[in-house]
């Protein structure tokens, strides 16, 4: 066992190397560094920087006091822990394959800023541990220049928003690792909702181009149009959970301007064009505010009662006095009764 002691102005550090493991202890704070193979360690307590060199292909685990865990596989790593105001901690880690440093800034109460995909465990206000898992695609490197990196800002421990406009809504997990509810909204406008969370609830999505599909894993995917205003659309899709795990989808057409008023029946082309002109004139007067938009059911109550009492034929047409007196327009029941009377008389 070999022991090395280095004296500095601020504190005394002791590095113990035994069986390929290195442990470093400092006064006032504990920093444990564990290696599986031999490595060279350079420590500077004034700046609190630990530089570790590891053989290619060997795993490295650096555990910093405060519950943070950083892992790397076979790459030189430099961890710089700088304490800030109000208990803030800033750590810099080199990104594999690039020349820049990856900076992680932790703000304990509720705001977290992360660049890159990491798994961070934070302590909630009620004492429950919350786990945030953020994944990003592999960063492309061209001519030594890294493409735009994903920046994620979590505020209030409820919503995570990236630089590309992607919004991630997360909720705390239980002790056994089960997620209560997970909703992912990518940039393409696709929403994935677990089918189990739809029990006893109704989800209404507006939009004429709304597409809803269900997969075999018990999830429901709703695709919404990205561009355009989906509020002023011509349709509404309602998902109502049924007896099974897959909710039923119902499309309800919204009434337009032409569906509010009933089309008159049995009119010729001249009458129809005249009706269209009257509707345009009425719409113009309603827009100017000269006439009310609400129309009364009838103009005179006496005429309405008289029209409702009149007999109507096929298609709702009224019988004229001439048609009513004609023999071929008589009631078929009355004609049958007269025929039976004639048969009885003949017999």
Curated annotation (Swiss-Prot):
Signal peptide: none annotated. Gene3D superfamilies: 6.10.250.2430. Residues 296-321 bind DNA. It is found in: Nucleus. The keyword Phosphoprotein applies. InterPro entries: CCAAT-binding_factor_CS, NFYA. GO terms for cellular component: CCAAT-binding factor complex; chromatin; nucleoplasm; nucleus; protein-DNA complex; RNA polymerase II transcription regulator complex. This is Nuclear transcription factor Y subunit alpha. The lineage of its organism: Eukaryota, Metazoa, Chordata, Craniata, Vertebrata.
